Regions:
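Positively charged, small/polar-rich N-terminal and surface patches that mediate targeting and assembly
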Residues: 1-135
Length: 135
C-alpha cells in the first residue's frame, strides 16, 4: 500500500501549462493520481479527505462546516504489489515529485468458519496482483 499526502488545492498541470491556467481550469491533483492508478492496473486507489489534523509541524487545521479546508492535508491511498507501486511512482514522477509518500507492506487476511462459532484466520503476503483478487 502506498499513501501519497497532498492538499486538496493542488492542481494537475498539463506539460507546458502555466500555474495560473491550472489554478482555474485544472482538475484536482488527487483526481489525476487516482485516474492514472486505474489506468496503471492498480487494485485500488482512494482519495481520503481529512477533517482535523496537522502536517510538517504546522498549525492544526479543521475542516470547515460549509465545505473543505484547502490547507488540510489529504491522502491518496493505492493498493497493489510493491513492484507495481514502484513502477507507478517512476512512471508518474511528474505528479508525485516532492510529495510525502509512505509505503506499507500488505498481508491479505481471509477469515473462514471451520465449525459453528469457530473462525480460522489465514494470512498471506501480497506480492502479485493475484494475491489481492477477491474470490
Amino acid at each position: 500500500m502506498l499513501r501519497v499526502y497532498l492538499t486538496p488545492k493542488e492542481r494537475f498541470r498539463q506539460a507546458g501549462g502555466s500555474r495560473l491556467k491550472a489554478a482555474f481550469s485544472g482538475r484536482p491533483l488527487y483526481q489525476e493520481i487516482v485516474n492514472r492508478a486505474k489506468r496503471a492496473g492498480l487494485v485500488n486507489a482512494v482519495a481520503h479527505h481529512t477533517h482535523y489534523g496537522f502536517s510538517n509541524h504546522g498549525h492544526v487545521q479543521v475542516r470547515e462546516v460549509e465545505g473543505m479546508n484547502s490547507e488540510l492535508t489529504m491522502c491518496v491511498e493505492m493498493i497493489g504489489p510493491k513492484a507495481t507501486l514502484e513502477d507507478f511512482c517512476r512512471a508518474h514522477g511528474d505528479l508525485l515529485t516532492d510529495k510525502v509518500m509512505v509505503y506499507k507492506h500488505l498481508e491479505r487476511w481471509k477469515l473462514g468458519m471451520t465449525a459453528p462459532g469457530r473462525a480460522e484466520l489465514t494470512e498471506a503476503d501480497v506480492s502479485t496482483i493475484e494475491d489481492l483478487d477477491s474470490e
